């Protein structure tokens, strides 16, 4: 039985939705939904984090942002992905509820880049669709739950799942709330399996006390409310 929901929209969005379905997509790109988006002007401290990370990634693969809440870590991390033209980016977090926030911020950063797509189990495109788009030259950001990834047989879990995620050559791995769920045996195994030789890893945390020893001073950006 078909759905009977009705939504108000203009003719152009209907045309774009039909075109998206013909391409095998399950959602419109954020740029096709809103026509009022403007580029985000980052605060000086945010731009400093972005610039330092790009500089570090030119010679290394690891970066940690020690930044308190309200800094804007999500937007800034996505800006790094955009500036460096990352083809395959994974967002890994112990808090799957933040998928909505990442999806919204993706639209703010990539609204004018139709070659970038977002996917997760609940938002945007499926992983299969994203890989198809990547095979055509597009780029994507995929959101994954640490809890789900830890359950995979490949890293010592109990379920035969996520093999396609682990076998993907990720260009960029963003670990959100990196102080949570990453220091257990399974958590470390997940990160190790996802991180290939050339994968850039950016860890985000407001309280990264269990992570500081893993990074050199040059690989850490710090921001607090009093700075």
Model-based region annotation:
Residues 2-40:
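Non-catalytic accessory segments flanking enzymatic or RNA/DNA-binding domains
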Residues 217-227:
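Interdomain hinge/linker at the junction between the two RecA-like core domains of SF2 helicases
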Residues 146-149, 161-203, 207-209:
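SF2 helicase catalytic motif II
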Residues 58-80:
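Walker A/P-loop
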Residues 59-61, 135-139, 155-172, 196:
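Short basic/glycine-enriched coil/helix segment immediately N-terminal to the Walker B
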Residues 74-110, 148:
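Conserved Walker A/P-loop ATP-binding site and its immediately adjacent core
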Residues 111-155:
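Inter-Walker segment of RecA-like/P-loop motor cores
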Residues 31-66:
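Conserved pre-motif I regulatory segment
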């Amino acid at each position: 039985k078909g759905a009977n929901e009705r939504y108000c929209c203009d003719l152009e969005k209907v045309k774009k939705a039909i075109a998206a379905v013909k391409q095998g997509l399950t959602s419109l790109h954020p740029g096709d939904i809103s026509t009022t988006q403007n580029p985000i002007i980052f605060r000086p401290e945010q731009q400093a984090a972005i610039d330092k990370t790009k500089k570090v990634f030119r010679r290394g693969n690891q970066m940690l942002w020690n930044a308190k809440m309200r800094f804007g870590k999500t937007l800034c991390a996505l800006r790094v992905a955009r500036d460096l033209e990352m083809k395959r980016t994974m967002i890994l977090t112990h808090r799957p509820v933040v998928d909505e926030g990442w999806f919204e911020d993706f639209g703010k950063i990539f609204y004018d880049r139709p070659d970038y797509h977002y996917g997760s189990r609940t938002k945007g495109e499926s992983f299969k669709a994203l890989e198809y788009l990547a095979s055509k030259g597009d780029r994507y950001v995929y959101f994954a739950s640490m809890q789900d990834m830890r359950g995979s047989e490949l890293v010592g879990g109990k379920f035969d799942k996520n093999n396609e995620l682990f076998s993907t050559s990720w260009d960029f791995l963003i670990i959100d709330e990196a102080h949570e769920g990453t220091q257990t045996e399974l958590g470390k195994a997940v990160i190790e399996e996802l991180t290939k030789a050339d994968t850039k890893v950016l860890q985000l945390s407001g309280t990264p006390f269990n992570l500081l020893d893993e990074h050199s001073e040059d690989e850490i950006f710090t921001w607090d409310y009093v700075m």
